[in-house]
Amino acid sequence: AMKIFMIGGTGLLGCEAATTLIKRGHQVKSVALPPLPEGAPIPKEMELVFGDINKKTDEEIEQMLEGCDCFIFAAGVDERKEFPAPVMDYYYKYNIAPLERIFPLCKKAGVKRAVVLGSYFSYLSKIKPDMNLEERNPYFKSRLIQEDVCKKACDDNFSVAVLELPYIFGTQPGRRPVWTVLIEQISGMDKLPFTLYPKGGTAMLTCRQVGQAIAGAATKEGAKGFEAIPISMYNMKWDKFLGIVYEARGMHNRKIVGIPPFMMKLGMYGIVKDYKKRGIDSGMDPLQLPYIMDYDLFITDKYTRDLGVEDDDIEAAITDSIKVSQESYEGKVKLLDMKGE
């Protein structure tokens, strides 16, 4: 059995990982920001330290890492969280700086392995260099820098796996799903007889499967050096995905009309104006987003299955996420937002 130290053990993904690891007989200790989401299924065997890891001293962190075999970073922010300019500073603070600080402490404490939750946009940047994604999207750039920090930390006694995560579905009681943003975007078209949407698609999996992937990566036998693993269990076109979304919203047989990027781009100028007005520095270039969403960002499930991930009901997970997002959007439930720290 292994001892594992995790940052973000009460979050949607960290909690799933902890549950899987504990079920498999490992010990998990985590630092998390209070408050706990109401009714969240946090495993009682997990040793929880409440507080902000960034406010703890090196000595305190080193003490927590003492005797641990693996460090899991299940915290950070994704591209849906809004920040003022310069957005890179915030990505650095939440997604990169903690690793630069904790990796050396891991090594001092004798921790041999780390697993970091990254983004499949890094995978896209690497396979489509012609799109210049990192120049135009600070979020993409920050995730590639994060991978670089992980790569540089590796040595003969320390290996790091970055899980390049795609769209994730599933809910945690008391926590607002990130998909509330999607409801905000599409509900504006509810009065139209159809929904206009890009023609691409995406890789995806359920939060339970992400938990299994994290556990598999953490306990991987004979892992050496740096690995960036593109994660996916299902690939779905946007129109099929939206079909499930609209069913979950009670709008049956909704007509989805695929539009080319230039048409979606026309609608994005308003968003650029809105960001300017509100002082938001977007992590994604709104004028390039139509081209990203026109692409089938599909990934084979091979690498994920290699980590011991099992099948799950993706349609049920999407439905669940959307139902809670819809309620949240309508203001029916008080839910905790994703926190950066």
For each predicted feature, which ranges?
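Conserved Rossmann-fold NAD(P)-dependent oxidoreductase catalytic core, especially the SDR/UDP-sugar
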Residues: 97-141, 161
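Conserved beta-loop-beta element that borders a ligand/cofactor-binding pocket
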Residues: 151-174
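Terminal hydrophobic/aromatic helix or amphipathic segment near a protein terminus
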Residues: 242-297
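N-terminal Rossmann NAD(P)H-binding glycine-rich loop of SDR-like oxidoreductase domains
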Residues: 4-24
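Glycine/proline-rich active-site loop of Rossmann-fold NAD(P)-dependent oxidoreductases
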Residues: 170-183, 217-228, 251-253
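Amphipathic terminal alpha-helices
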Residues: 294-341
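A conserved pocket-lining segment of Rossmann-fold NAD(P)-dependent short-chain dehydrogenase/reductase
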Residues: 184-205
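NAD(P)H-binding glycine-rich loop region in Rossmannoid oxidoreductase-like domains
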Residues: 51-97, 101, 123
